[in-house]
């Protein structure tokens, strides 16, 4: 009998796509909120505009797996490039929300990766991508309102690296300056800021380097077997994928060899 799939129906975290850093979007978003104020409606305005990509039920010791899942998505972000469309202000329960189109494939893939890494992700009910504008004390009928914004979602757009981020946020986290205080916040543009200095790992590293790199990392980051560790480092180095960035960020020895382009053993 197949194992029953676990859902985050009692979530404690979510993967967040913050929006406060996009000035074009924020100009229209704040204008929409000001219309609610001018209409004299008693509501709580959303101070942290965002899109929840998926909900999670995880423990703190799984944060690294979430980080690696996000980094894995960023490795393939070109597959999700396009425009994110915000439109159709309407009531969803007690909240006035915008429909969001363009994150469907990203949602499906990050849920799959998170589950593969042992994290309980997504809910048994259908995911409805939306951006909350305001919350009311009770369900309310709102007269037709207009909103449309197209946000380019590209690693590089008009020669500028993206401002997009993917975050891990604990439900109930405090809010500062339009953003949640997150457990992890990963800039999508870092995918283009890292580049191995040589085509092959073996061009500048030797087997003697493995223990020095392992000593800079947390236990379990690298396989205990040197050959397996070498294979993993070589694979990610030559493809410029997430684990290369992780080791580059956390191993002084690894960064030094990359900078010097030569083993120092």
Curated annotation (Swiss-Prot):
Classification via Pfam families: Corona_NS2A
Entry annotated with the keyword Ligase: no
Signal peptide span: none
Species this protein is from: Murine coronavirus (strain JHM)
Localization of this protein: Host cytoplasm
Chief location of this protein within or outside the cell: host cell
GO cellular component: host cell cytoplasm
Function in brief: Not essential for virus replication in transformed murine cells.
Keywords attached to this entry: Host cytoplasm
InterPro entries, A to Z: Coronavirus_NS2A (IPR007878), Cyclic_Pdiesterase (IPR009097), NS2A-like (IPR039573)
Coiled coil: none
Designated name of the protein: Non-structural protein 2a
Family the UniProt entry places it in: Belongs to the coronaviruses ns2a protein family.
